A protein has these predicted regions:
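Conserved alpha-helical substructure of the radical SAM core
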Residues: 1-120, 134-138, 142, 196, ...
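Radical SAM enzyme [4Fe-4S]-AdoMet core and its adjacent flexible, acidic
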Residues: 5, 13, 28, 33-45, ...
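Processing junctions and N-termini across compartments
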Residues: 12, 16-19, 247, 342, ...
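Short cysteine clusters
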Residues: 18, 22-25, 253, 272, ...
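Non-transmembrane alpha-helical segments in soluble domains
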Residues: 52, 82, 149-152, 176, ...
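Cysteine/selenocysteine-centered motifs that mediate thiol-based redox chemistry or coordinate metal-sulfur cofactors
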Residues: 300-367
Length: 367
């Protein structure tokens, strides 16, 4: 069960703003323009401070600044938010994902000082100087590397996250060597599972970029391929209709097992970031987009949005309710019960089903 007394990690998307325009990110339209369904908002420092009092912070294991749409460094008061958590618990693990492409090196050195040995930054650096911009659009390689080095030099623990595409797979070993010389704690080679046609359950060979002749392609080297994506032909042979797999697979919820939940930039407490994707991702509204997902619909409505509306998003929001109060909502128990009946949510079966685990096959590391 999702129990307030045992949840010890909160994944907080403190903003939906971002400096980048990654073509496969749900916050923009294939690398051009902002997703019109997504609200642009910062989660106020005062709201976070009120929701996470000292008693709660004293028993938490981790605060993870990550989300579906935004980069935490775009929040105008991010350093203050970090300081609030550190003041309430000197050893609370503060973890974040970022592209690292804004602010000066002094800002990043300051983050290292606030973390003070209890935290980590994962820098999303998908390539080297000649390739990073092909996916991390609007991000300047030299700035990211200077900021990462400043963080490391100030005592910060950093991990290099490298999403492998065809255009950068030849640079993985160079990146490993550079990460070592810069004293990154680790380099995580991420095996993307995003090239998926949800309707045919086949791999998309090329992902378009709006107003560009460039396309994104999955890597060729089997070492960098997502295991579940390679398993797709076998999965289709096992089921007359792939929908049958999602209707019957056992579900092992990563969030519940990991004793963690997510809070989006509007302050809504959700089981995971994948629920947040369903709320605003254009691919769940426009079937013509690559990666669009018809199985997530029920009677023309997104399943997740419809499910949450029964309980009221306002009732799940930390602007209106304490975290303890949010977990008293019957939504949490109903969600768990849904995994064992015909009214299960497709997203739960897709993300945490037993045989097709493309999300977790991408690779991930917290500590």
């Amino acid at each position: 069960m999702f129990d307030f007394s045992v949840i010890d990690e909160y994944q907080i998307e403190i903003t939906s703003y971002c400096n980048a325009a990654c073509p496969q990110c749900p916050r923009n339209d294939l690398g051009q323009g902002i997703n019109p369904y997504m609200p642009l908002v910062h989660l106020a420092r005062s709201v976070i401070d009120r929701a996470f009092d000292t008693d709660l912070c004293s028993r938490l294991r981790q605060i993870f600044f990550c989300g579906s749409y935004g980069d935490p460094i775009m929040h105008p008061d991010f350093l203050g938010i970090l300081r609030d958590f550190r003041r309430k618990n000197p050893t609370l693990w503060l973890y974040m994902h970022t592209n690292g492409g804004v602010h000066d090196p002094e800002y990043w050195a300051e983050i290292a000082g606030i973390m003070n040995g209890y935290g980590q930054i994962d820098f999303g650096i998908d390539g080297l100087e000649d390739t990073l911009h092909l996916y991390r659009k609007n991000v300047k390689y030299s700035r990211v590397m200077a900021n990462a080095q400043a963080f490391i030099d100030a005592g910060g623990r950093a991990q290099w996250n490298f999403i492998v595409f065809r255009h950068n797979e030849h640079q993985v070993e160079q990146a490993r060597a550079l990460a070592s010389s810069m004293r990154f704690h680790n380099i995580l080679v991420r095996k993307t599972g995003r090239f998926l046609n949800h309707e045919t359950m086949e791999e998309i060979p090329a992902w378009p970029i709006k107003n560009s002749q460039q396309v994104l392609e999955p890597p060729i080297n089997p070492e960098y391929r997502n295991t579940s994506m390679m398993f797709l032909p076998d999965l289709k042979k096992q089921y007359t209709a792939v929908k049958d797999y999602f209707d019957t697979t056992s579900i092992r919820c990563d969030a519940m097992i990991g004793r963690k939940v997510a809070i989006n930039a509007e302050g809504v407490v959700l089981p995971c970031n994948f629920f947040n994707h369903n709320l605003y991702d254009a691919r769940f509204r426009d079937g013509s987009l690559p990666g669009a997902n018809p199985l997530s619909q029920h009677n023309g409505r997104n399943q997740i949005a419809d499910f949450l509306s029964r309980y009221g998003l306002d009732n799940l929001n930390i602007h209106n309710n304490s975290l303890a109060g949010v977990f008293e909502n019957t939504m949490w128990a109903d969600l768990v019960n849904s995994w064992n009946n015909e009214h299960r949510l497709f997203e739960c079966a897709m993300t945490c089903g037993s045989k097709f685990t493309k999300v977790w096959d991408q690779g991930g590391s917290v500590r």
